[in-house]
Regions:
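Conserved beta-loop-beta element that borders a ligand/cofactor-binding pocket
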Residues: 188-191, 198-200, 204-206, 216-240, ...
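N-terminal Rossmann-fold cofactor-binding loop
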Residues: 108-112, 130
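Active-site-lining helix/loop region of Rossmann-like oxidoreductase modules
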Residues: 86, 238-323, 327-341
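N-terminal Rossmann NAD(P)H-binding glycine-rich loop of SDR-like oxidoreductase domains
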Residues: 81-101
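Non-catalytic, hydrophobic alpha-helical segments
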Residues: 90, 146, 221, 231, ...
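NAD(P)-cofactor binding segment of oxidoreductase domains
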Residues: 145-148, 153-184, 215-220
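SDR active-site strand-loop-helix element
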Residues: 84, 108, 149-150, 184-190, ...
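Conserved Rossmann-fold cofactor-binding substructure of NAD(P)-dependent oxidoreductases
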Residues: 124-144
């Protein structure tokens, strides 16, 4: 009798808990007619609904038409490229790659004296911290393109994922709109669009929901009205330029890639018009030619980015765990019956 009650309760929970755990979503209206994108379903975290819902509702503004409609550049122009996170391990490779082209470069860091001394180069170093929006006003002034390689440290606090890759991204995007920035190239990570991948669930559970905050930061950029390129690299390590680079969408692949290769893709996104308004993953693939990746941008689709993170354990995992518990209970009961019968 007790087992029957347990089964009924489990069945009720599995088939009724989904709407209780689910998040609300709604279509983000595209007010800018210059950006023809399909309706994007925007996640509305319940934790923000009663507090400050407008944090997930960036006002869509019209971007200046001073440049070409496609948003691409030719190397005859000298746009101002702002690199945020320039003194980081990936940001340094970005600066090195940009320095090979005829560009104006502004490097942002939270410790410009140390960064300038360690990295050198003919860069305009400016102090900026995405968690302090007032520091972004001068840092982004007159910027044409932003390349962001910012990352968060594990844990909570001012350097944690929520503060840096979510709220910090909101600060960055809002100031970029005021500054008239026309293209944001943002380094995210694989897993930000894989809502039910095991690795994503694991990192969200044990790394302070890192991928949830990255996913929501990505969505804020997508809904900003500014041209964007969201690059999701795999694990970062190794020497650049030794293997081919595989492009994919929908957050269905896993792998690794050197920081130097990631920087090359970020910088190429400045010039390639096929990179505009795309979200994609990149990993190394030894079966591909080393330089063939530059032709992959044209195969990417807009509006393809996987699933937006909620940070909660997916319903399928809850159901699987409950069924597993039920089976374990059933096995225990059978063993006890056999012992009694013996």
């Amino acid at each position: 009798m007790q087992f029957t009650k347990l089964f009924i309760l489990t069945f009720f929970f599995v088939f009724t808990a989904k709407p209780l755990l689910a998040h609300q979503s709604e279509c983000q209206e595209q007010l800018n007619s210059n950006f023809n994108r399909p309706c994007l379903e925007r996640l509305i975290p319940r934790s923000l609904d009663p507090l400050n819902r407008n944090m997930m509702q960036p006002s869509v503004v019209k971007v200046s038409n001073q440049y070409s409609v496609s948003g691409s550049l030719t190397e005859d122009n000298q746009p101002l490229i702002v690199v945020i996170g320039a003194s980081g391990r990936t940001g340094r490779f970005v600066l090195e790659s940009l320095a090979k082209r005829d560009l104006r470069i502004r490097a942002l860091s939270r410790n410009i004296a140390k960064a300038s001394a360690d990295i050198g180069g003919n860069y305009e170093w400016v102090y900026a911290d995405v968690t302090q929006p007032e520091t972004l006003v001068m840092a982004l002034q007159d910027s044409d393109i932003i390349i962001s390689t910012i990352g968060a440290k594990p844990g909570k606090g001012p350097d944690g994922p929520e503060s840096v890759v979510y709220k910090g991204v909101i600060n960055l995007v809002d100031e970029a709109k005021r500054a008239g920035t026309r293209h944001i190239i943002y380094m995210s990570s694989i897993g930000a669009g894989g809502a039910e991948n095991f690795s994503t669930v694991f990192l969200n559970l044990f790394m302070n929901k890192t991928l949830k905050w990255k996913s929501l930061g990505e969505e804020y950029i997508r809904n900003s009205g500014i041209d964007f390129t969201l690059v999701r690299p795999g694990g970062l390590y190794g020497d650049p330029g030794t293997q081919g680079i595989k492009f994919d969408q929908g957050d269905k692949i896993i792998g690794s890639i050197p920081r130097g290769d990631v920087a090359s893709v970020l910088v190429e996104s400045v010039y390639n018009p096929d990179a505009i308004n795309k979200t994609f993953e990149i990993i190394n693939d030894e079966s591909l030619p080393v330089d063939a990746w530059k032709d992959e941008f044209k195969n990417l689709k807009t509006g393809e980015y996987g699933k937006i993170q909620s940070g909660r354990l997916p319903f399928s995992y809850w159901g699987s765990m409950l069924i597993l518990v039920l089976l374990i209970v059933l096995l225990i009961r059978r063993r006890r019956r056999r012992k009694r019968a013996a």
